[in-house]
């Protein structure tokens, strides 16, 4: 009868043969190698069943189908062919952090929140840079560069002592008069600042101070402002980066933008 047998060229094959009492033989070739190397051909093979006219014919069309199926299995699936994979980022490269953009200034650099925009507003002496949230200008960052006779930031004293010399960064009380405000304010005061945390570090041989301050006003605007200040001295200049966000937005996601901007600040 006409039968179809499959062979794998240039590779070893494993075979098994079994014989039944009725003298019907069959041969099977099994391989775990690449299916696109599979070759099929039709063969003439005699069998006792041919005399009874009950022969089973495997057509060449079936053999061709086997080849097509093997080629399909052996082919590689590209990322473009698997749209669902792109959405899940299964095949793609690890996504880069797009929340921040690198900013290189004159003698300093830092990471700026990608959705914040540059602003021409100048608040403080020596201010050379300002970025703010397009939807809430309370969330912003500034960089100031001013001359100094200090050789290191530690020459200003402790972080707390340094803050008293640059307290203008926290904003000045605009109202002076007799008033008693709720919320723990002293008599006659409508604004307060609490130093929450201080730290110091050395980067590239330069000493840095980082201060976390919570300022509040009697009008309760935003529940207060979280302000992070990073400062250092280099080449006879005092470099300060201050980033801030309102208390409400601070806990709604703005915290990471403020902290990253302040802690990424460094001088060349």
From Swiss-Prot:
It is found in: Plastid, Chloroplast thylakoid membrane. GO terms for molecular function: calcium ion binding. The keyword Plastid applies. Coiled coil: none annotated. Keywords: Chloroplast, Membrane, Photosynthesis, Photosystem II, Plastid, Thylakoid, Transit peptide. One of its GO terms (cellular component) is chloroplast thylakoid membrane. Residues 1-82 form a transit peptide. It comes from the Eukaryota. GO terms for biological process: photosynthesis. The keyword Thylakoid applies. Pfam families: PsbP. May be involved in the regulation of photosystem II. Belongs to the PsbP family. This is Oxygen-evolving enhancer protein 2-1, chloroplastic. It comes from Nicotiana tabacum. The gene is PSBP1.
């Amino acid at each position: 009868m006409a039968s179809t047998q499959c062979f794998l060229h240039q590779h070893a094959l494993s075979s098994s043969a079994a014989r039944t009492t009725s003298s019907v033989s069959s041969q099977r070739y099994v391989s775990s190698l690449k299916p696109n190397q599979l070759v099929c051909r039709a063969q003439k093979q005699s069998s006792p069943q041919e005399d009874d006219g009950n022969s089973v014919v495997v057509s060449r069309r079936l053999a061709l189908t086997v080849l097509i199926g093997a080629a399909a299995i052996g082919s590689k699936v590209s990322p473009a062919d698997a749209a669902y994979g792109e959405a899940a980022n299964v095949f793609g490269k690890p996504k880069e952090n797009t929340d921040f953009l690198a900013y290189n200034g004159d003698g300093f650099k830092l990471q700026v929140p990608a959705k914040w925009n540059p602003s021409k507003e100048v608040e403080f002496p020596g201010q050379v840079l300002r970025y703010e949230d397009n939807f809430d200008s309370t969330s912003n960052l500034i960089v100031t560069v001013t001359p100094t006779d200090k050789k290191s930031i530690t020459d200003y004293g402790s972080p707390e002592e340094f803050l008293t010399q640059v307290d203008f960064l926290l904003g000045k009380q605009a109202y002076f008069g007799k008033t008693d405000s709720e919320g723990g304010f002293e008599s006659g005061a409508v604004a307060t600042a609490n130093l929450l945390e201080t730290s110091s570090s050395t980067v590239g041989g330069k000493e840095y101070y980082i201060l976390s301050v919570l300022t509040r006003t009697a009008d309760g605007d935003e529940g207060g402002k979280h302000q992070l200040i990073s400062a250092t001295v280099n080449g006879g200049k005092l470099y300060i980066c201050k980033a801030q966000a309102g208390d409400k937005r601070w806990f709604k996601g703005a915290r990471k933008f403020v902290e990253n901007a302040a802690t990424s600040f460094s001088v060349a």
